[in-house]
Amino acid sequence: MITVNTLQKMKAAGEKIAMLTAYESSFAALMDDAGVEMLLVGDSLGMAVQGRKSTLPVSLRDMCYHTECVARGAKNAMIVSDLPFGAYQQSKEQAFAAAAELMAAGAHMVKLEGGVWMAETTEFLQMRGIPVCAHIGLTPQSVFAFGGYKVQGRGSKAQALLNDAKAHDDAGAAVVLMECVPAELAKKVTESVSCPTIGIGAGADCDGQVLVMHDMLGIFPGKTAKFVKNFMHGQSSIQAAVRAYVAEVKAKTFPAAEHIFAD
């Protein structure tokens, strides 16, 4: 079974980590069998599964239900579950109560969004036995504050994002996830923190990559984000597509130049 120690050893060895979102047991089992090391039960389910316009309406009850489903299908992969909007920002104690519910539902790690200001919560959780993935850069729960889905950390804002990563690393975060961050900055962050980094739209130099399942399978019609690749092209099955994703992450051929953001 993949553990926090496994991820640390992979970072040290330069072996890339493959992560995908999963929301139910059958896909979790398929991804697990295909060699995906980490399964993210993301609040992205609000958009991908529930058909909502953002992640904000997703409840803790929703997250626990889908975590239970994924846990029934996964045998080897690490399960990371999102703390949903409103379930952890009020206080460290509120965050612990919500995280404990997700862990009881089958999560091995919880993910929270936010920079330096959330590092205290990261420390509070990890000191109480709950591994934390700290999500920085573009944090979808703050999309309205950002004014849309925009690249974060460009120009003069680069140092602030680096500070966010270091604060969570110092607080004991098990993983730092960066979304929509210039590739060179993501590389600098990866080299500056002791914990593994996972990127989505953050270049090829992170310690691992993550995509939303529906994106990598080409399920969403119309225009997709720059960092998305449809791995179903040329494949005869979903499992083959997932294996292709894992292989390209491991070989460092995904993300390619067309999937990354410059400063």
Swiss-Prot record:
Its cofactor is Mg(2+). Its EC number is 2.1.2.11. The keyword Transmembrane does not apply. GO terms for cellular component: cytoplasm. Mg(2+) binds at D43, D82, E113. Pathway: Cofactor biosynthesis; (R)-pantothenate biosynthesis; (R)-pantoate from 3-methyl-2-oxobutanoate: step 1/2. Coiled coil: none annotated. This is 3-methyl-2-oxobutanoate hydroxymethyltransferase. The gene is panB. Binds 1 Mg(2+) ion per subunit. Belongs to the PanB family. 3-methyl-2-oxobutanoate binds at D43, S44, D82, K111. The lineage of its organism: Bacteria, Pseudomonadati, Pseudomonadota, Betaproteobacteria, Neisseriales. InterPro entries: Pantoate_hydroxy_MeTrfase, Pyrv/PenolPyrv_kinase-like_dom, Pyrv_kinase-like_dom_sf. It comes from the Bacteria.
